[in-house]
Amino acid sequence: KDDVLTLLIHLGYLGYNSSNQTCYIPNKEVIDSFVNSIRSSNWNETTKALLNSRALLEATWNRDEELVAKYIEEAHLDTAILTYNNENALSYTISIAYIYARNHYTIIREMPSGKGYADMVFIPKDDKPAMIVELKWDHEAETAIDQIKEKKYYCGLEKYLDELLLVGISYNKETKEHSCIIERYR
């Protein structure tokens, strides 16, 4: 990925902002060309999934629990899992749903921490909050938050405690609905 971006920067198709280490499209001509290529491509589903993933991440940062549950629900419907009947299937869906987060985080699954293993830990690469995501299959999302606290999954993340989000995501197999609770670490 970095090699391609570097090449596009050297060719003048992209600019680089060194203060926040991001790429941008430098002029209207290149923007128009980019927009036309996206419009004429067959990447509609991929583009939608990436936009939803970005919106999911922003909803998580904003602690919009209902919107997070909605985007997880959409990701679940888009994944081709034959049997959505355990926490591993839920974990797969969450990994796909948060694919955009890789731009801002190193994501560690089953991270040893405190008195057990946190399902997913998002360690920031930039100024975003760290996140611990705990998944529950057929239990309340509050149970996931309680487990994060009781098992002290935040151990090892001391430098992020001022900006740490605890995220509990659950799936109810009877109602076939996802729920979410997001708290700041205190």
Label the model's feature ranges.
Residues 1-141, 146, 150-152, 163, ...:
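Extended alpha-helical interface modules used as scaffolds for assembling large macromolecular complexes
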Residues 152-156, 162-170:
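Low-complexity, intrinsically disordered Gly/Pro/Thr-rich segments
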Residues 170-177:
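Short, conserved secondary-structure transition motifs
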